[in-house]
Amino acid sequence: MQESISNTPLVVPRSEHSISRANISENALKVLYRLKQGGYQAYLVGGGVRDLLLGREPKDFDVATDATPEEVRKLFRNCRLIGRRFRLAHVHFGREIIEVATFRGGGSEDTEGERHIENGMIVRDNLYGTREEDALRRDFTVNALYYNIADFSVVDYAGGLADLEAGRLRLIGDAPERRYREDPVRMLRAVRFACKLGFNLEPSCERPLLESGHLLRDIAPARLFEEVLKLFQGGTGLSAFEKLRHYGLFSHLFPATEDCLSHEEQAFPITFVSRGLENTDRRIQEDKPVTPAFLFAVLLWEPVRQRYRELVAQDRMPVEAMLLASGEVASVQQPLVAIPKRFGLPMREIWALQPRLEQRQGKRPYRLLTHPRFRAAYDFLLLRAEAGEVETERAEWWTRFQDANGQERANMTDGGGKRRRPRRRRRRSSPSATESAGAD
């Protein structure tokens, strides 16, 4: 098997690259120096090196070393070992976690550890090896760059520096189909990095995407949930959505939604999901919070809405119909992309409030204002109005109602604000003198 990786790496000295320790997390540097002082090799690796070379601020700093996880734990009291598929060491510094991975091996006789492969997919990879073998085990060339704390050089085995310069995303190795089969999540990572970095996928890596989406069904639903968050909560969610659909991957993550989107409604394309993801991207760019509950409410709304309409047509009451539709869609989705309860329950509450937002008379609007999911449900209603799904008048009414004073709210909910005359309590008549006398 011929792999596109060099036995003799390109080593770029400190004077010829742009990475400065001033831009590296202080805690990551502590880990690197402690490993070096312990007699181990220590490298900053992966997306952190890539982003530093691109002039971006890394989100995470990962470390690679020849120390085993157990040896790492002996060096750091604040270390915790995690993972079954990939054994990793997490070194905790308050809220920051530095992930430390032992060099992965290629499977030669002198490597240490174990690897299990089922149907071509690596289900456990705790086989340890050399730095060169570790580079071979990585996914993309731009993620196989090593920053050496010993001499501050950058080590490149796979042509990642040239690909960074060219804006090209390329899988390591000469068999992209096999690399995707080893770990199907690499297909989602290919889409995510292409969107995040603005890079073009190398054609040999792009072609298999169109035929390999079914492999995602072999990935644990909980892991796919985490990958979906990375795809859609990184600021390029709309672009990721469009690429996932282009490569036929979205249908394997959200088949019910894809089925709805593939059919136009009254000769108009359904735009709600696109508008929702565009709104999410904008909020992230403005440093505003976004929640997984709202994101998944957007991604699964079309099948919920369709089933809701069917149930209402069967004479179900709107609130009941929405609860039934929500439950059906969520239960079908759960085996594919598992949504934790802490997000699944508020997601369903956002949906459940939609028919209740149609009720604008009496005390109901006041009660809705105090509901813990009202704001999210209101924002969801605004998106529906933008997509032409509901009348803009309804969304505007709720906007005005929130801003109105007491009398204005009364006028909006009581048709003119006329106060009812309070009913008088009937006074019990006292016994007459005659009756009193007769009682004796």
Regions found by a protein language model. Give the residues of each.
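Catalytic cores of the polymerase beta-like nucleotidyltransferase superfamily
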Residues: M1-D440
